[in-house]
């Protein structure tokens, strides 16, 4: 089931294949469907949302059912266990503590001649958070997306998630949303939810930024609306890449690989090690742990299609293969992970050492688990406070400072053929030099 590869060229080919697993002709067909859904939501608003909820979720809603009301929110607390509520609050505390250290702070710099330069950070007006739902429940994704928005100071935070077959939202999701500070919750999902957040409907006001993971339809919808709203990233199937040496425990490695593969049939789990015996023992451990796995069929399919065990010449070669893949999650299960870290350039989140399984980061370590996938860690980052903030440059000049750069600006504007740019400086300097002389406009009047 798990393929063992010992040739570098074959390993490179397979890693590229797995990284491109979402790029298919089927995606092109799905994009056409998503485009139609978005257009209908833009034109028909709530009517389209209700129709698509019935079609895709098999749930019939009335217009007033889209919003999750106070009674359902209050009742959610009665339907979660004390242990789960305690875990949600612990996760919230740790996630919030981490993100408070990441707030982008405004600054100004005072230079000679009275020049002031700086940057001013402000939150977006409204953030939309997409949380997968239906039969599944992901309260951790609520915490990981909502808390950075709250810390950023976003005044309106909206959460959308598809209902279950009874038309309800999982109580754990509702509790996590309330604990995190979400302001509005709507029971809609899929591409239609992204359309509602982008264009607005009678019930749902539009937002400025959309964040959160979803299926291929949600991802394509985010891709198509980007530019009208901001987005965090285009999420693909989940993935983990583990670099291990002889100090690693194959039982732990197998568990970490299965933890990724059990997500869905497109998930990827890759182990790279210079220790051939460790590679073989890990494959054996995977087989043993799969015997009574409750999601065995799905997990086996994932491992068969997108699971690899690669034996390399050394750890440097392993790091090079990891950089080629640019994984969402990277585990460094080696004797000195901080030394190996120096060779790592591309990864969404990096877990260092034998006692740091990815699951710690998935739930409560602090950094968001909403991370770049499908090789996008080469240029993208995970969700954070900065996802919900934007920056304005600050510039102030005095007449004296403007005079010192006037000649340079005049030369540059002349080179670009933009005379009014030059005039905007020249006219000011003329007035500053002769404050009592009339400007050209005054002369013409």
Swiss-Prot record:
GO terms for molecular function: histidinol dehydrogenase activity; NAD binding; zinc ion binding. Keywords: Amino-acid biosynthesis, Histidine biosynthesis, Metal-binding, NAD, Oxidoreductase, Zinc. It catalyses: L-histidinol + 2 NAD(+) + H2O = L-histidine + 2 NADH + 3 H(+). It comes from the Bacteria. Zn(2+) binds at residues 260, 263, 362, 421. Binds 1 zinc ion per subunit. One of its GO terms (biological process) is L-histidine biosynthetic process. The active site is at residues 328-329. The keyword Oxidoreductase applies. HAMAP family: HisD (MF_01024). Catalyzes the sequential NAD-dependent oxidations of L-histidinol to L-histidinaldehyde and then to L-histidine. This is Histidinol dehydrogenase. It comes from Gloeobacter violaceus (strain ATCC 29082 / PCC 7421). The lineage of its organism: Bacteria, Bacillati, Cyanobacteriota, Cyanophyceae, Gloeobacterales. The gene is hisD.
């Amino acid at each position: 089931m798990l393929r063992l590869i010992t040739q570098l060229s074959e390993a490179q080919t397979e890693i590229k294949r797995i990284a491109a697993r979402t790029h298919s002709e089927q995606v092109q067909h799905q994009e056409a469907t998503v485009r139609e859904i978005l257009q209908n939501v833009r034109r028909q608003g709530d009517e389209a949302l209700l129709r698509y909820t019935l079609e895709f979720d098999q749930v019939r809603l009335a217009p007033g059912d889209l919003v999750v009301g106070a009674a359902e929110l209050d009742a959610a607390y009665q339907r979660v266990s004390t242990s789960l509520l305690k875990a949600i609050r612990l996760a919230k505390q740790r996630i919030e503590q981490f993100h408070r250290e990441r707030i982008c702070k405004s600054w100004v710099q005072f230079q000679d001649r009275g020049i002031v330069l700086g940057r001013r950070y402000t939150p977006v007006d409204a953030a939309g958070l997409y949380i997968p739902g239906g039969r599944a429940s992901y309260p951790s994704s609520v915490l990981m997306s909502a808390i950075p928005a709250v810390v950023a100071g976003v005044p309106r935070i909206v959460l959308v998630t598809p209902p279950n077959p009874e038309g309800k939202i999982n109580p754990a999701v509702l509790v996590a949303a309330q604990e995190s500070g979400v302001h509005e919750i709507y029971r809609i999902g899929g591409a239609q939810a992204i359309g509602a957040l982008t264009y607005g409907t009678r019930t749902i006001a539009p937002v400025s930024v959309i964040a959160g993971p979803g299926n291929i339809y949600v991802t394509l919808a985010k891709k198509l609306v980007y530019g009208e709203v901001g987005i965090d990233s285009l999420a693909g199937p989940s993935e983990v890449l583990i670099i291990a040496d002889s100090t690693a425990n194959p039982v732990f490695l197998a568990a970490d690989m299965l933890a990724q593969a059990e997500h869905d049939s497109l998930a990827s789990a890759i182990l790279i090690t210079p220790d051939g015996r460790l590679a073989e023992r890990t494959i054996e451990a995977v087989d043993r742990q799969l015997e009574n796995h409750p999601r065995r069929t799905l997990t086996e399919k994932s491992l068969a299609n997108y699971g690899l065990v690669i034996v390399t010449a050394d750890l440097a070669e392993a790091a090079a293969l990891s950089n080629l893949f640019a994984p969402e999650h990277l585990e460094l299960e080696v004797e000195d992970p901080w030394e190996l870290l120096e060779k790592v350039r591309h990864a969404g989140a990096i877990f260092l050492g034998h006692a740091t399984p990815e699951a710690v980061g998935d739930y409560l370590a602090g950094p968001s688990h909403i991370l770049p996938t499908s090789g996008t860690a080469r240029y993208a980052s995970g969700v954070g406070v900065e996802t919900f903030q934007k920056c304005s440059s600050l510039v102030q000049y005095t007449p004296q400072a403007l005079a010192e750069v006037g000649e340079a600006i005049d030369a540059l504007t002349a080179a670009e053929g933009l005379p009014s740019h030059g005039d905007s400086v020249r006219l000011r300097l003329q007035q500053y030099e002769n404050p009592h002389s009339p400007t050209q406009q005054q002369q013409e009047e």
